[in-house]
């Protein structure tokens, strides 16, 4: 006999997985002892943070349209009266107050959160009994995956959603391994803070519930700990719940609109294909991980996690969820797959599969890095996207195809729009400037005007789109309204004494609605903005 790299013994001639007798019997064993944290894995965690710092310094792109919305929500912060979970707005105001409103400062938040995602993936591999090889392979699979690279560059709740899902998985892994009830408390914290970030944490909660009912853990409901975890989650996430109650559950309208305009186009084939394309070798590792969690005797105490992964996959398929919704489960499955490879007892086979998986993961990751880190300028990025030929990488939520990935297209042209509006505003007589109000057709345009307007000296910004409707019409009556993104013939809800097409802003790299954007000046409308607000109502995706 000999001892392998992870500290287990096995016969050199044995084919398959190294499973100790104590593991099969469920008795305490060496595998229950948490292996040491691999130094190389920690180096990879640090490398991820450094990569995002570098990308944030040298990026040729602006803020994403969604970031403008969350920054505006922070400016109009009303924690218990918000249509979206308030955590991003709170973070936005904290960043603005501590570090200033710079692109680098805001993007360091997802960079740190994304680094924490990678660290949690390593810790999960360790909790599953993974030694150095398993931890490093898990770290590689997450590090170069374009899904996790991109989410860690965008000031959005996506990376926070990934973080809290994974923290919940880590709590379940430790609960399975130790039986210590305190891990229920961490699960509750993950659910509660996750509810402050994104409502999709509810799908994780549903998947956990299904998994608990399908495993031996169903008996836990006879005790206090699961209920205490639920209570903690509800208390911590209560601002999100209270906001929905006070506003009449706008999330229902949001989801209905999202389903009609975007999710209806998501089919099973597309959903699965995207899981593969993010990391083809990683996908095989994830499939191995799911299988290992469900059927491998040595990991049978972690079967709960396997059912969480299966249940969440089924939920998103049934609800036609976007492909990235399942992203938080990938690190868990990478970890389980890496542990499975590490447990192969034939040394040469184990080495060949592990090194082969690592090489395949890194090779695809290097090729896909431009789709994860926004460092390549638009024109060469468009050429690269065309040369690669992966159409799903440049497909929008509406099924259209762009020269750039949609997230990249949504990071172009905003400052040009604000500067064009500023020129139109400054061309007005002083009396009209004193009365002027800016109107953005969608939350990206309104948010960009609101953000850059402070620097450019622009008047207040209003919009009926998304959360901006809740911010209200402001105090000015709107005797002069400068519309951004609205054609003159589309202004029908009010009648203007004069209507002037003052300018147009073109952006060949933007999404279709931002490529040729009109700027229209409306003078002496037949109603005040306050009357207009009460009459028209809002639209979340307008």
For every predicted segment, state its role.
Residues 45-47, 138-143, 191, 195, ...:
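Short helix- or helix-capping micro-motifs
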Residues 174-192, 223, 227, 307:
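Short hydrophobic alpha-helices at membrane interfaces in multi-pass membrane enzymes
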Residues 147, 153-160:
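Short acidic/glycine- and proline-prone juxtamembrane loop motifs at membrane-interface regions
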Residues 202-302, 316, 370-374, 385-388, ...:
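Transmembrane-lumen/periplasm boundary regions of multi-pass, lipid-linked membrane glycan transferases
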Residues 2, 20, 39-42, 121-144, ...:
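Transmembrane-helix signature of polytopic, membrane-embedded enzymes
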Residues 108-129, 167:
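Transmembrane-helix motifs of polytopic, lipid-linked glycan transferases
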Residues 76, 139, 183-198, 232-235, ...:
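Membrane-interface alpha helices of multi-pass inner-membrane proteins
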Residues 126-128, 168-184, 289-297:
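Membrane-interface transmembrane helices that cradle and orient dolichyl/undecaprenyl
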């Amino acid at each position: 006999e000999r001892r392998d790299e992870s500290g287990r013994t096995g016969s050199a001639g044995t084919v398959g997985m190294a499973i100790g007798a104590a593991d099969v019997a469920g008795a305490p064993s060496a595998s229950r002892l948490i292996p040491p944290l691999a130094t190389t894995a920690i180096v990879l965690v640090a490398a991820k943070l450094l990569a995002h710092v570098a990308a944030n310094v040298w990026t040729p792109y602006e803020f994403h349209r969604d970031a403008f919305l969350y920054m505006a929500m922070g400016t109009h912060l009303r924690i218990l009266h918000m249509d979206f979970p308030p955590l991003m707005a709170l973070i936005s105001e904290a960043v603005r107050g501590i570090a200033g409103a710079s692109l680098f400062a805001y993007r360091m938040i997802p960079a740190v959160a994304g680094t924490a995602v990678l660290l949690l993936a390593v810790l999960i591999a360790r909790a599953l009994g993974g030694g150095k090889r398993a931890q490093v392979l898990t770290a590689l699979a997450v590090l170069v995956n374009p899904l996790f690279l991109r989410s860690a560059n965008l000031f959005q709740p996506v990376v926070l959603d990934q973080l809290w899902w994974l923290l919940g998985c880590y709590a379940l892994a430790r609960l399975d391994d130790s039986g210590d009830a305190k891990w229920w408390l961490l699960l509750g914290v993950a659910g509660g803070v996750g509810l402050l970030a994104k409502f999709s944490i509810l799908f994780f909660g549903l998947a956990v519930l299904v998994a608990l009912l399908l495993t031996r853990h169903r008996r836990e409901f006879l005790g206090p700990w699961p209920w205490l975890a639920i209570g903690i989650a509800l208390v911590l996430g209560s601002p999100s719940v209270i906001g929905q109650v006070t506003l009449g559950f706008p999330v229902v309208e949001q989801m209905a609109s999202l389903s009609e305009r975007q999710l209806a186009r998501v089919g099973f084939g597309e959903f699965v294909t995207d899981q593969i394309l993010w990391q083809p070798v990683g996908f095989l590792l994830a499939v191995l991980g799911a299988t290992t969690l469900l059927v491998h005797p040595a990991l049978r105490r972690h079967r709960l996690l396997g059912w969480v992964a299966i249940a969440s996959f089924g939920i998103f398929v049934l609800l036609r969820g976007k492909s990235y919704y399942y992203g938080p489960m990938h690190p868990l499955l990478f970890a389980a797959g890496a542990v499975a490879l590490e447990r192969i007892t034939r040394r040469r086979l184990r080495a060949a599969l592990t090194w082969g998986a690592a090489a395949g993961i890194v090779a695809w990751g290097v090729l896909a890095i431009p789709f994860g880190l926004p460092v390549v300028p638009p024109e060469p990025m468009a050429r690269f996207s065309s040369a690669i030929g992966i159409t799903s990488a440049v497909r929008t939520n509406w099924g259209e195809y762009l020269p750039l990935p949609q997230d990249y297209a949504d990071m172009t042209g905003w400052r040009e729009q604000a500067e064009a509006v500023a020129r139109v505003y400054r061309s007005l007589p002083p009396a009209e400037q004193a009365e002027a109000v800016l109107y953005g057709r969608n939350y990206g345009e309104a948010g960009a005007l609101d953000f850059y307007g402070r620097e450019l000296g622009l008047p207040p910004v209003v919009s009926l789109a998304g959360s901006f409707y809740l911010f209200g019409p402001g105090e000015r009556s709107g005797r002069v309204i400068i519309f951004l993104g609205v054609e003159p013939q589309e202004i029908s809800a009010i009648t203007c004494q004069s209507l002037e097409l003052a300018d147009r802003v073109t952006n060949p790299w933007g999404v279709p609605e931002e490529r040729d954007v009109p700027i229209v000046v409306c003078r002496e409308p037949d109603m005040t903005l306050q009357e207009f607000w009460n009459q028209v109502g809002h639209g979340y995706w307008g």
